[in-house]
Amino acid sequence: MAFRGVDYFCVDSLLSEEELMVRQTARRFAEERVLPLIRDCYRDARFPSELIPEMGELGFLGANLHGYGCAGMSNVEYGLVMQELERADSGVRSFVSVQGALVMYPIHAFGSGEQKSRWLPRLQSGRAVGCFGLTEPDFGSNPAGMRSTARRDGDAWVLNGEKTWITNGGMADVAMVWARAEEGILGFLVERGTPGYSVSDIHGKWSMRASVTSSLSFADCRVSESARLPGAKGLKAPLSCLSQARYGIGWGAVGAAMDCYETARQYSIARKQFEGRPIASHQLVQEKLAWMITEITKAQLLALHAGRLKDQGKLEPAQVSMLKRNNVAMALDCARLSRDLLGANGITDEYPVMRHLCNLEPALPAPKGFECFFTP
């Protein structure tokens, strides 16, 4: 049965025709292209890279950026795309988030004209894939403590250090790498195949299995001055990228929660126990479903208001953190309740609930720590 949406408070009435059309496009892509293959991808720990060109054609990559072939969507439209992609699987949403918010955004915001012209059209179309190298083995929630270094050597820079838990790392044509120099924290575009730059994929994950996660290593990796983003100086630059990513996660979590709720609702209607009655006829089950839809509705309204503020240029980083913190925690609770309602069936991959539950676990701290969002 095709997904019709979860809207118990007429939230759709707050969306424009253009926003509804964008959501329908993303919803159709999720239904027709992602869902038929995502269970096998999750089983096989494989990212469906065959979908990348189509996501580029649909304008999903760098969707809310302008120029260089980007779709120029509003931030609400971009959020709706994130919602629908995560409803299918977080691995697909994460790919799009990293490509747009963590690679294309810093190039767009801090890059030179030559860097923008060279990379943005290729990244937008999916002809090139990027990754974001910030997290280190000893510094995850505290990026200010990074040990990766950039040392000027004539007209070049020499990079040394390690990055880990890097989405898209093993498939990336270019890495957006952050390192400490005498001038402060700087950003560099390091291409695949650069001497001294190596990548190893992280295996054995219980979560985000339909996503590539890697470690990056830099050993006297020499890049030219043209690889440095001239407008990126200090920790504020990478932190601004994280705010872009958190915004997308906040919307995506709503999609995962919707899928868990709808799965539990349909299951509880079809599942009959105790004299042949649907388990949905019991008040205990009804209370759980009512709690889920109430929390989803609040999360929808929070995401929509955040999107409106962002489109007006008024959304603050702390507000983005609140959006992401609230909505991911809500989605995790919905996934756990849904798994409970499905009983033993909840742990099988015949249903998407356990996949969402596993995927949402690292989304709670990522990027950069659940407990750190509101600390001074």
Model-identified regions with their sequence ranges:
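A short core secondary-structure module
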Residues: 156, 160-200
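Short glycine/proline-enriched turns and hinge-like loops at secondary-structure junctions
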Residues: 73, 142-144, 168-172, 210-211, ...
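Short Gly/Pro-enriched turn/cap motifs at secondary-structure boundaries
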Residues: 138-141, 165-168, 180, 205-212
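A short, charged helix-loop
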Residues: 214-240
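N-terminal glycine-rich flavin-associated loop
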Residues: 94-114, 140
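A short, Trp-centered hydrophobic/proline-enriched beta-strand micro-motif
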Residues: 126-134
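Flexible, small-/acidic-enriched active-site or ligand-binding loops
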Residues: 145, 193-224
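Alpha-helical interface subdomain recognition
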Residues: 1-88, 98, 110-115, 122, ...
